Design a protein with these regions (language model features):
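N-terminal structured subdomain of primase-like DNA metabolism proteins
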Residues: 1-91
Length: 91
């Protein structure tokens, strides 16, 4: 497996919750005992048990931090992978 595939794989293993707890801890709001939303987007629901998020008002969702960064924060894929690799460096 090449370096880029390892970087992408490591980034894909980071959950939305891990990303938000690290970079935006004040943004998470517990909605129920199983779900969170964010202070900025109350229709964006995160379910930690399965790793999914869904932003109901925008009709987008995903299951990892790359999806969140590209679909919610508008970051390009390469920048998202680079940022997440800072959290989980590839050996």
């Amino acid at each position: 497996m090449g370096k880029y595939q390892k970087n992408i794989g490591a980034a894909r293993r980071i959950t939305v919750m891990q990303y938000l707890e690290t970079y935006h801890p004040g943004e998470l709001v517990r909605k129920t005992d199983r779900e969170y939303c964010t202070r900025t987007h109350d229709s964006l629901i995160i379910t930690p048990a399965n790793g999914f998020f869904h932003w109901f008002s925008r009709h987008v969702g995903g299951n990892n931090a790359i999806d969140y960064l590209t679909k919610v924060e508008g970051m390009d894929f390469v920048s998202a992978v680079r940022l997440l690799n800072e959290m989980a460096p590839v050996a």
